[in-house]
Design a protein with these regions (language model features):
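Acidic, polar-rich low-complexity tracts and alpha-helical solenoid repeat scaffolds
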Residues: 1-239
């Protein structure tokens, strides 16, 4: 049951009563019921501190209820309505988390599961948006208590997106689509230069250019690799 048994009793509820009931549902993990109660609170008492807190917790409840689009919409609304609120950093954080989780399923699959050709456009977009959300949080609120976690997630996202380029480049190599493989690997080097993916990206470029008989480009990639990764096990695999 999403709402208390006797809905008509809510006619007499104060803002505090709505809030405490919603918070109880939230704490119990009944997120859909909490969202309804926060909505009722805001409809009845749209102004003031409690309504603002309800808006913020609505974003959190949607996030916990696996409704990333609704969580992002609620967080965006809070940021727009209350840009100088003392807890507005949390809205930025929830927005980033919602996009992060939206991209996480595909990321985990790419990192651990069978080879996929590519990240879907949606997952790639969610990763990029999550990165931008966290970047905005740490730029605007460097002292925020959420900033350290945001920075860690940014580092993870960059590595994961770079690795997705490598997975795709490997796929193209297996298909003997050497130009596509070289382009993907080159993109990983250019866009994500300080990630673990760079080492293998250079190796793929060397292989692809060799197959294409583009020897100058092959030699350039190998030179960069020997300078930056002199102990790379990939170098041992080169002819």
């Amino acid at each position: 049951n999403l709402l208390p048994d006797r809905t008509e009793d809510q006619q007499d509820w104060s803002a505090n009563k709505f809030y405490s009931e919603a918070k109880e549902k939230l704490n119990d993990g009944n997120f859909a019921a909490a969202i309804k109660l926060y909505g009722s609170l805001e409809a009845r008492y749209p102004y003031g501190r409690i309504a603002q807190q309800a808006q913020l917790e609505t974003a959190y409840a949607h996030y916990k209820n696996d409704e990333p689009a609704s969580a992002i919409a609620a967080a965006d609304r809070f940021i727009k309505l209350h840009p100088n609120h003392v807890n507005v950093d949390y809205a930025y954080y929830i927005r980033g988390l919602s996009n992060f989780n939206d991209s996480w399923g595909m990321m985990g699959f790419l990192m651990k599961g069978p080879l996929k050709q590519d990240m879907s456009e949606r997952d790639s977009k969610a990763s990029q948006e999550s990165f931008e959300n966290f970047k905005e949080l740490v730029t605007r609120f460097p002292e925020s208590k959420y900033a350290a976690d945001a920075r860690q997630r940014m580092a993870y996202l960059i590595n994961a997106v770079a690795m997705s380029e490598i997975h795709t480049a490997r796929y193209y190599m297996k298909r003997k689509a050497y130009i596509a493989a070289a382009n993907r690997a080159q993109n990983a080097v250019k866009e994500y230069p300080r990630t673990p993916a760079t080492e293998e990206a250079l190796y793929i470029m060397i292989q692809a250019y060799e197959a294409l008989e583009m020897y100058d480009l092959r030699d350039d990639a190998e030179r960069v690799m020997r300078i930056n990764f002199p102990d790379s096990h990939f170098l041992k695999e080169l002819p």
